[in-house]
A protein has these predicted regions:
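N-terminal Lys/Arg-rich, disordered targeting/topogenic segments
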Residues: 1-3
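Sequence signature of WD/YWTD-type beta-propeller architectures
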Residues: 6-15, 19-330
Length: 330
């Protein structure tokens, strides 16, 4: 009897070892197959005191500092040659961009000048009260200018453009609900907006994804019930939307009006945070944040990458407790 138990245990251990080795091999092959992709970029203040903006190599899982400035809420340009972000430090407050070739920083517009702009459209000014989390969110390149959420609750999407040395501003969308993320399709001036949907009956909030034309009242709900903590993403051609509805990650096809299952991510005292597609839309990078005990600290970040065609998944990194991330893009 004892020998039988030992034999069964040995077989089970052997099966588990083989399964683990298989998963490692599949993950290695998947990461090896990711070619011609820009690096992941993120801004962070590490527990050890180091801070700034970094680029992350998926294949060797190493990171390199590219700026001493923390580019909060950062995002790539369409050609991946620059990133735009919010600088929220004593030495500068406002929008800035970073050249991804030589890593030079160029201020775009200061908070002081932004406040002058928003006065023209009757939005409340934002005051700088020291380094921390900015109230200027999700800056992006759009046409020959820039867009962003204005204010803590991110209800207004603004578009600014400099012409003859003067900044012009236009409100593209303004609602009563907090905005999570947005995408703009230039040709049709179409807005894809992830926002909150309050459920009065159970007093919780979930997200919805809507589509509308700027300056028109033609709002359509594309996806109902998304996770309120995670951010949607779209590929460069804006034909699909990737989103998380616990515990599953889906890809919604705008052309067929159907959703496809990609993978599952079960959360235990965690939140799904960033979802970022590769430039070709084949791979999905996402982050899961461990919730600190009694919210005594920041999320402990975990990096994952999944093949949207096969569902194969790799855990790239588990960062240290106390590392605070301010923005990620791929």
């Amino acid at each position: 009897m004892r020998r039988t138990i030992i034999k069964v245990c040995a077989i089970l251990i052997g099966i588990l070892c083989m399964f683990y080795m298989y998963k490692v091999y599949v993950g290695y092959q998947m990461v090896k197959g990711i070619v011609d992709q820009p690096p992941i970029v993120f801004s962070v203040r590490f527990k050890n005191g180091d801070r700034g903006t970094f680029k992350y190599n998926i294949k060797n899982r190493k990171y390199e500092k590219i700026s001493d400035y923390i580019f909060q809420e950062l995002s790539y340009s369409d050609d991946y040659e620059k990133i735009i972000g919010v600088i929220w430090e004593d030495r500068f407050q406002g929008l800035a961009e970073l050249d991804m070739e030589d890593y030079t920083l160029r201020p775009i517009i200061s908070l002081k000048d932004l406040n002058k702009c928003v006065k023209e459209v009757n939005l409340k000014e934002i005051e700088y009260d020291g380094p921390g989390v900015t109230q200027l969110r999700m800056p992006k390149y759009y046409k020959d200018g820039y867009t962003f959420f204005w204010g803590y609750y991110s209800t207004a999407i603004c578009y600014i453009r400099e012409e003859d040395g003067k900044w012009n501003i236009r409100i593209l969308n303004n609602t009563d609900s907090t905005g999570h993320n947005y995408f703009l399709k230039e040709e049709q001036e179409t807005l894809f907006l992830e926002t909150e949907k309050p459920f009065v009956e159970n007093k919780t909030e979930t997200g919805i994804i809507i589509k509308k034309t700027i300056d028109k009242d033609d709002e359509i709900v594309l996806v109902d019930v998304t996770d309120e903590n995670s951010f949607i993403d779209m590929p460069d051609d804006m034909t699909k939307i990737v989103y998380y509805s616990e515990p599953k990650i889906y890809m919604y096809n705008l052309e067929t009006d159907k959703k496809n299952y990609i993978s599952s991510q079960f959360l235990i005292w965690q939140h799904m945070l960033y979802l970022k597609l590769s430039s070709d839309g084949r791979y999905l990078f996402y982050t899961v944040g461990d919730i600190p005990f009694f919210w005594s600290d920041y999320y402990r970040m975990n990096f994952f990458i999944v093949d949207t065609k096969t569902g194969n998944k790799v855990n790239l990194n588990r960062w240290e407790k106390g590392d605070r991330f301010y923005g990620i893009d791929w």
